[in-house]
């Protein structure tokens, strides 16, 4: 799968999930506007590596600390969570479980 198509699929899954909050991301990290990148693209390419959170509901540093295998393979932590982690029972932060976020309607998991 080529990188452009993979990026498209990842962005689509993230937007559908509800775990990327553009307003939160821009207000929490004002430097993002200076990057000339769309905020979601910034998170995927730069922000996650810097430990930035895509929303209040997903803690990038927490997820990587508690899932060292994710850090080791180098996949974006939010992408990993949506593809595998949620189904494996991994939590997106230290405040809520995956089940709680789904029950509250914050997280939308795909059925694939």
Name each model-derived stretch.
Residues 1-112:
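Charge-rich, low-complexity intrinsically disordered regions
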């Amino acid at each position: 799968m080529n990188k452009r198509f993979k990026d498209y699929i990842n962005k689509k899954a993230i937007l559908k999930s509800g775990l990327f909050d553009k307003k939160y991301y821009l207000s929490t990290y004002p430097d993002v506007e200076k990057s000339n990148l769309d905020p979601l693209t910034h998170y995927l390419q730069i922000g996650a590596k810097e430990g930035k959170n895509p929303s209040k509901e997903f803690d990038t540093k927490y997820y990587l600390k508690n899932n060292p295998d994710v850090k080791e393979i180098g996949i974006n932590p939010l992408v990993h969570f949506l593809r595998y982690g949620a189904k494996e029972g991994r939590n997106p932060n230290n405040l809520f479980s995956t089940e709680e976020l789904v029950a509250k309607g914050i997280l939308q998991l795909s059925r694939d």
